[in-house]
């Protein structure tokens, strides 16, 4: 499981070249001409991703994280879930499948959680 911010997810998208994850969760698509890996690696959250092992020192994404993002990009089935509590901000989650692989991407405010 990886917990990061919306900006952290953007850094991972730029490094892996995954242009789109889940627009249903209000996540912006990657613009390859502007959102380059070099630019993303200069973002302060890149150091946090390196500290938790999502990125290596060369700026490459962990292979498992790359696979999770690929499932989101190439999904053939997706289920959107909204969990709300009165008076609180809802948590939204996309449960996505590609072939036999399943990945969940949750969003609560600025935090995102990605896991199989």
Model-derived features: positions:
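Accessory beta->alpha helical hairpin/"wing" motif in late/C-terminal subdomains of nucleic-acid enzymes
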Residues: 56-103, 107-116
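Short, amphipathic alpha-helical interface elements at domain boundaries
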Residues: 1-50, 54-74
């Amino acid at each position: 499981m990886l917990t990061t911010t919306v900006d952290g997810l953007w850094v991972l998208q730029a490094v892996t070249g995954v242009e789109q994850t889940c627009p249903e969760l209000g996540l912006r698509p990657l613009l390859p001409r502007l959102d380059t890996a070099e630019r993303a690696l200069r973002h302060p959250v890149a150091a946090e991703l390196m500290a938790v092992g999502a990125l290596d020192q060369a700026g490459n994404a962990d292979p498992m994280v790359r696979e999770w993002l690929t499932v989101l990009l190439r999904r053939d089935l997706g289920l959107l879930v909204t969990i709300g509590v009165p008076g609180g901000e809802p948590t939204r989650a996309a449960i996505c499948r590609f072939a036999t692989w399943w990945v969940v991407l949750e969003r609560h405010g600025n935090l995102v959680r990605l896991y199989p």
